[in-house]
Amino acid sequence: MTDQMRLEISKDFAFEAAHYFEHEPEGHPFSRLHGHSFAGTVTLAGEPNAHAAWVKDFWKIETAVKEVAETLDHRLLNEIEGLEKPSLEAIAAYVFARLDDKLPGLVAVEIRRPSCGEKAVLRRG
C-alpha cells in the first residue's frame, strides 16, 4: 500500500435502548421516556499484517464491540454513568472511549437511529 492509501475495516452492531432528555421543556417530545433501535459502526484503519493479511481479526473486533453493546442493550441510557445526557453524540463518545484501548487503530464510531434518519460520527483527528 502507498502512503496516499489507507485501509479501513468496519464492524456493525445494534442495540435497543430507551432514554429521555430532562433538560427539554415540558411538552417537548424528547423530554418523555422513549426508545429506539440503534445501529452502530466501528471503523479501524491500518496496514494488513503479514501473518493473516488483515488489519485486525474481525472476531476480536466483534468480541470487543459486543461487550460494549451489551452495556447499552435494553437499558435506560440515562442511568449509565457517562450517558446522563444520552444524545447520539454522547453515545458515540461512550462507545469510542470504551473501545479505544481494546482496538488499536480505531478511527471512528458511528451511532445511528435508522428509523429517524439520524446519525453521529466521532472520528479521531
Locate each region found by the language model.
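Charge-rich, low-complexity N-terminal segments
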Residues: 1-125
